[in-house]
Swiss-Prot record:
The keyword Coiled coil does not apply. It comes from Methanococcus maripaludis (strain C7 / ATCC BAA-1331). GO terms for molecular function: rRNA binding; structural constituent of ribosome. Residues 1-13, 23-38 have a biased composition (Basic residues). The lineage of its organism: Archaea, Methanobacteriati, Methanobacteriota, Methanomada group, Methanococci. This is Large ribosomal subunit protein uL15. Residues 1-38 are annotated as: Disordered.
Length: 143
């Protein structure tokens, strides 16, 4: 709704223009500081009541050296890779032999579809990848 007169025009003569006492509109003194100021001083009780876990440390950060991160490839992507570079792979008993570690991958995951019978060698396989490789007439070899 459009107002004909601005707020300041309405407030003329009221001295505080809607801010209560004259001192209340100056800086942040009326609020006890801006934002989180005073949370360990004069606002401590409200912190204890409404946000008791705000201060202090919780949990731990795991040592990055202990985390095992494997380079992964999905079985569908692996088949695309084989079809793209056919000449680079050996064929034994009608199955393409693929060593995933030679192309920079350690774990084979099960996303995607495959129709090529292949012998896949890798450090690890997901359950889905194992099922799909065997369903296509291939086999997997864990290194």
């Amino acid at each position: 709704m459009i107002r004909k007169s601005k707020k300041i025009t309405k407030m003329r003569g009221s001295r505080t223009c809607g801010y209560g006492e004259a001192k209340k509109h100056r800086g942040a003194g009326h609020r006890g500081g801006r934002g989180n100021a005073g949370h360990q001083k004069h606002k401590w009780l409200s912190v204890c009541k409404f946000n008791p876990d705000y201060f202090g440390k919780y949990g731990f950060n795991r040592n990055p050296g202990l985390i095992k991160q494997l380079e992964t490839i999905n079985i569908g992507e692996l088949e695309e890779y084989i079809l793209k570079y056919k000449d680079a792979f050996q064929v034994e008993d009608g199955k393409v032999v693929v060593d995933a570690t030679e192309i920079g991958y350690e774990k084979v995951l099960g996303k995607g579809r495959i129709s090529t019978a292949m012998v896949v060698k890798a450090v690890e396989f997901s359950e889905g990848a194992k099922e799909k490789i065997e369903a296509a007439g291939g086999e997997f070899v864990e290194l």
